[in-house]
């Protein structure tokens, strides 16, 4: 059996695409704004 090739790490995930990471940059804030206006249940990871 082949081993799993994608084993994500939560720290990396939060640091790159978490809410606070999004709020750090102008484009990230735009992402949050777009997701808010769309009515997403989850704004960030």
Swiss-Prot record:
<protein>
    <recommendedName>
        <fullName>Large ribosomal subunit protein bL34</fullName>
    </recommendedName>
</protein>
<dbReference type="GO" id="GO:0006412">
    <property type="term" value="P:translation"/>
</dbReference>
<keyword id="KW-0687">Ribonucleoprotein</keyword>
<feature type="compositionally biased region" description="Basic residues">
    <location>
        <begin position="11"/>
        <end position="23"/>
    </location>
</feature>
<dbReference type="GO" id="GO:0003735">
    <property type="term" value="F:structural constituent of ribosome"/>
</dbReference>
<dbReference type="InterPro" id="IPR020939">
    <property type="entry name" value="Ribosomal_bL34_CS"/>
</dbReference>
<dbReference type="GO" id="GO:0005840">
    <property type="term" value="C:ribosome"/>
</dbReference>
<comment type="similarity">
    <text>Belongs to the bacterial ribosomal protein bL34 family.</text>
</comment>
<dbReference type="InterPro" id="IPR000271">
    <property type="entry name" value="Ribosomal_bL34"/>
</dbReference>
<dbReference type="GO" id="GO:1990904">
    <property type="term" value="C:ribonucleoprotein complex"/>
</dbReference>
<keyword id="KW-0689">Ribosomal protein</keyword>
<feature type="compositionally biased region" description="Basic and acidic residues">
    <location>
        <begin position="1"/>
        <end position="10"/>
    </location>
</feature>
<dbReference type="Pfam" id="PF00468">
    <property type="entry name" value="Ribosomal_L34"/>
</dbReference>
<feature type="region of interest" description="Disordered">
    <location>
        <begin position="1"/>
        <end position="27"/>
    </location>
</feature>
């Amino acid at each position: 059996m082949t081993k799993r090739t994608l084993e994500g790490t939560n720290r990396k995930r939060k640091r790159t695409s978490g809410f606070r990471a999004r709020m750090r940059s102008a484009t990230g804030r735009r992402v949050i704004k777009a997701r808010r206006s769309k009515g997403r249940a989850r704004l960030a990871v």
